[in-house]
Amino acid sequence: NFMNQHIAPLSIAGARKYDYPPAFTPHSPWWEYYRELTLHFARLSLALSSGGQYNDVLVLEPTTSIWMYYTYNAPRPNRWRTMGEEFQAFITALERHQVEFDLGSENILLNHGSVKGDRFVVGKRAYGTVVLPAQMENVDAATFDLLERFAAKGGRIIAYGTPQYVDGARSAEAEAFFADPAKVTRADAGEPIDYSLFATPEIAFDAPEGNYLFHHRRRMDDGQLLFLANSSLTRPVRGTVTLQGRQAALLDTRTGEIRGYEAQREGDRLTIAYDLHPAGSLLLYVFDEEREG
């Protein structure tokens, strides 16, 4: 929720004379329109830092696995760089298919991870599903201990690979654990991702053409915020989203106005249609109960 106006011309000494950063001053021809843009981002920043985001899926980062292959003078292409690119492609695919997840750092798990019942806890968040990407060949001993305890309590682990190392050393115990279907749900990294594994009753999207849609959802005391963004600069995105709630409102980030937004209600669920122009966005508030006015 922070926008950084990158680069400022403090002087034109040295190499700076070859750079052409914008001048954020009345001298710029777009200055009179700049307030409208910054108000949009200010309202959006407030909205997307209010309430809390509560995702049920935790995707572990393969950081320690990549470090096993890292060498300063490695030729290109090299294994550690490829692993990073593959992992980025994996989580981007999840985002483009509207999977709600958080990323888990093993270093953070070391000090803030625990298991409570069938929930994998990290700080103030708790997860019912933990995902190990195909690039995860190693796990820290502390992470492996948490995963064993999580599985014993009935937690769901989805593994796209079989980690064979614990703290960088080959581990028969780890291989046996991740190969046990009673403890771990195996997913074939060579096959298309089965997104039904990540389905949640809280929210469901149709399949918008082109996979250009991204969304962000935050829980509030009396409802939830839903932000939709079209990442394409040339194509519109249209579709519907169904989520829990009884009434919807549009939060206009351009004008600051709040007004009703049409939705089809069935019981305690709303189906909302969206039509976003290229690079367009939509910020909605979905109330748990009907409200007047």
Show where each model-derived region lies:
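Carbohydrate-binding surfaces of carbohydrate-active enzymes
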Residues: N1-G293
